[in-house]
Structures are given as C-alpha cells and as structure tokens.
Regions:
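Beta-strand-rich solenoidal segments
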Residues: 1-23
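Solvent-exposed, conformationally flexible loop/turn segments
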Residues: 9-10, 124-126
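Extracellular attachment/recognition segments
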Residues: 64-66, 72-115
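Short, structured beta-strand segments at or near domain termini in extracellular proteins/domains
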Residues: 125-137
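Surface-exposed ligand/attachment interfaces on beta-rich extracellular proteins
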Residues: 24-48, 56-77, 116-125
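Broad, structure-driven detector of short, well-ordered beta-strand segments within folded domains
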Residues: 1-4, 44, 99-105
C-alpha cells in the first residue's frame, strides 16, 4: 500500500473486481521475539470485514520468549481470535505438536505459542512460524 492520494475512485460490490489484486504484500513493523524480522512471505487479503493474513517465514534468531508479529489491520474489539499454526520451529527444531496463534480484542499484533496452551518459545537459537491467520476487523 502506498501513502499517496487516491485518484480514479470506483466502487464495486464484488469480492474481487476485475484487475483488483487479491493479496497485498505486508512488512510487519512489530516483530517481538526475533533479533530481526525473519525473511519470508507476509501478505494479506481482506474480504468484507475479514482479514486473511498469510505468514510463511524462514528461521530467525530468537531473542525473547514472547513471539509476536504486527498485523496489517487492527482486529475488531468484539472477541479474541485464535487458531493453529501450520508449522513452528523452536530452538532450531520443528515442533511435532500443534502450535497456536492468538489475537486479543482490538490488537495490532498476533501472538504465537509453541503449544495449544500458553507455552513460550526458547530465548535462544532459531524460531519460525507459518500460519494463515484469519480475523475480523
């Protein structure tokens, strides 16, 4: 997205009007728990008031137990959103149990747990998450 004046406005009630891009690249500003933002794919797609946020990153250097990534659109304030990750790596090892993502009400970031509870990631080595995060805004 560009910080520019909008010109040539048009309205469409279709979910994906002709020539309208469905996925937008995104660079998270918040990346808590890594020494630098891991390289990879961060993109989102909005339909109505639902955001689909695709995260597919490479291993990054862990520097904290709390693991969070900024979101492209602030979450709605009516509920907490949560789901399972497609892949998670902690201290260089692929986790064999399910990891999860959580978005609190009105949050601007998504938090990751290394299990389906509140388990935090190791503060050293490498870590990685892969998830399709779906939430209302």
């Amino acid at each position: 997205l560009a910080n520019a004046t909008i010109s040539g406005q048009a309205y469409s009630y279709a979910a994906a009007p002709q020539r309208f891009p469905q996925w937008f690249n995104y660079t998270p500003i918040i990346y808590t728990g890594w020494s630098a933002l891991p390289t990879g794919t961060y993109e989102f797609y909005a339909v109505g008031n639902t955001c689909f946020y695709n995260i597919d990153q490479s291993d990054g250097t862990s520097n904290g137990a709390t693991t969070q990534l900024g979101m492209p659109i602030t979450a709605a304030g009516n509920q907490v959103f949560s789901g399972a990750c497609g892949l998670a790596v902690d201290n260089g090892a692929i986790l064999t149990g399910a990891a999860r993502w959580v978005i609190e009400k009105s949050s601007t970031w998504v938090q990751f747990q290394k299990d389906m509870g509140t388990g935090t990631f190791t503060t050293s080595g490498t870590k990685r998450v892969r998830a399709l995060v779906i939430y209302e805004f």
